[in-house]
A protein has these predicted regions:
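Short pre-active-site segment immediately N-terminal to the catalytic Zn-binding motif
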Residues: 169-173, 277-303
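Beta-sheet-dominated interaction scaffolds and their linkers
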Residues: 50-71
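Propeptide-to-catalytic entry region of secreted or membrane-anchored zinc metalloproteases
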Residues: 133-250, 421, 426-458
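Solvent-exposed loop and capping/linker segments of extracellular ligand-binding repeat ectodomains
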Residues: 1-50
Length: 463
């Protein structure tokens, strides 16, 4: 049975602890017991604990005018003892738990300060540190990374999550967004058809930096979080609502716009959320793994493959027939939507979606029928030995390239032509050669890859 105060069984328990420069807080009813107890009485300042906390304890913002919410938990009446002159609170005093609006006025340089709250009946305080960082763009400001030169313009939006004002002021955020854009276009056919896209980003400031998980909580702009079982999750409605503020994005073209969220983490584990109407959010972490499971591989597989191309996974997890798996229903669902052109449930040469490539001399050296895909070794077929949709290599198969180009033409308001496709098609043979030399085929995929998730209907913001 425990005692209060806890017995100090070793006289050296607090050795090295400075006992005169901080206050030891304990429940009020046992203050005198602690002051008299062996070991504990060595602390020079022992006082009653009071309930007064501010959430968050730290606010970071850019130097434009901005607002943040604070929650003050107090056991009684409280007041603001002091604050920076460039900070305004919606209330300077109150009673018990209170939600406050903190307004930070615009500034021109870095500055920091402290807001101190005090319980009125006690000499007891808590604080919130406030930082304001100098940056050339404001919170949520939309930036154009590229304007289209061909067609009517296809929206491609890169946003980060888990980047706080300090990260952004250092230039980390914009550097990452530009790098992600270049990775997206560093694979065919996107490299060739790059001029069809309008590319945007916006200064999405998160209260905290990093991404949370099961045992870690992070307050971020879009709520991106790692889970144990279903990959990355986010606040999809918040993301769509945010993107709809970009002038060229509207209800009529949201389903043809691709959103790429880059969580501020080097962990692997990308995933794409897709809606039946075509809307998509690709979560693409900055993986620190080696090729082909690096950040480039995730963007090209998740964003370029799933999010825009509507391609299916070709990697294998299970040595079994797909007919025995509940995922067969998901496969057929995708097929009914006109997706997954790179996969087939039949191995008959004249019935697969890529039949026109098999006997075409320009493609017949690599295009055939290979069994295995959609996580299963049997009952599902792919067109080439290896591709980006298997293990993230920097190469899309011929049928995948065609499916992507067809979608580009559709969204750009142009008519697709197979002859034009072939004329402009670039295989990327160097990357294909690298894949066949360095990688294994038909083996299990990296352990924490997640298939895309299909949601019914349209995003709820459009309903």
């Amino acid at each position: 049975k425990g005692t209060i105060p806890a017995d100090v069984v070793d006289s050296r328990a607090f050795e090295g602890v400075p006992k005169d420069n901080f206050t030891l807080e304990v429940p009020e009813i046992v203050v005198e017991q602690y002051r008299a107890a062996p070991g504990w009485r060595e602390f020079k300042r022992i006082a009653a604990h009071r309930e007064l906390t501010c959430r968050p304890t730290m606010v970071k913002a850019l130097n434009g005018k901005s607002e943040r919410k604070l929650i003050l938990d107090a056991e009684g009446e409280w007041e603001v003892e002091s604050k920076p002159e460039w900070c305004t609170l919606s209330a300077m005093s109150g009673n018990k738990k209170t939600e406050l609006t903190l307004t930070l006025e615009s500034g021109t340089n870095y500055r920091e300060g402290e807001i101190i709250f005090r319980l009125k009946d006690y000499d007891y305080t808590t604080s919130c540190r406030v930082y304001q960082y100098d940056f050339e763009y404001a919170d949520d400001e939309v930036l154009v990374l590229q304007n289209h030169k061909v067609g009517q313009g296809i929206n491609l939006i890169f946003l980060g999550d888990g980047y706080d004002a300090e990260d952004i002021s250092r230039g980390d955020y914009l550097q990452v967004m530009n790098e992600q854009m270049e990775r997206f276009f560093a694979i065919e056919p996107y490299r060739t058809y790059r001029d069809y896209f309008d590319v945007y980003t916006a200064i999405a400031v998160s209260p905290e930096n990093g991404i949370g998980g099961v045992n870690t909580i992070r307050d971020t702009k879009f709520g991106t979080t790692f889970t144990n079982d279903v990959g990355l999750l986010g606040e999809y409605d918040e993301i769509f609502a945010y993107v709809m503020k970009i002038p060229s994005v509207n209800e009529s073209n949201l389903s043809q716009s691709l959103i790429v969220i880059t969580p501020n983490t080097t962990d692997y584990g990308g995933i794409t959320q897709m809606w039946e109407d075509g809307s998509a959010i690709a979560f693409c972490p900055l993986s620190g793994d080696n090729y082909p499971y690096d950040a480039r591989g995730i963007v090209q597989h998740e964003a370029g493959g799933h999010g825009f191309g509507k391609l299916g996974d070709e990697y294998i997890y299970y040595n079994s027939f797909i007919d025995d798996c509940l995922c067969l229903g998901t496969f057929k669902w995708g097929k009914a939507l006109g997706w997954y052109e790179n996969l087939s449930l039949t191995g008959k040469m004249h019935e697969v979606p890529w039949a026109h490539f098999i006997f075409d001399d320009r493609y017949s050296d690599v295009v055939d029928i290979y069994e295995g895909g959609f996580t299963h070794t049997r009952g599902v077929f792919r067109s080439e030995q290896n591709s980006c949709m298997n293990n993230n290599i920097q190469y899309h198969s011929a049928i995948s390239r065609e499916a992507i180009v067809k979608r580009i033409m559709l969204y750009a308001g142009e008519t697709y032509s197979f002859d034009e496709f072939v004329k402009n098609d670039k295989r990327g043979s160097d990357n294909l050669s690298r894949s066949t030399r360095d990688m294994d085929f038909g083996t299990k995929a990296r352990g924490n890859q997640y298939p895309p998730v299909i949601h019914k209907g349209r995003p709820s913001i459009l309903k």
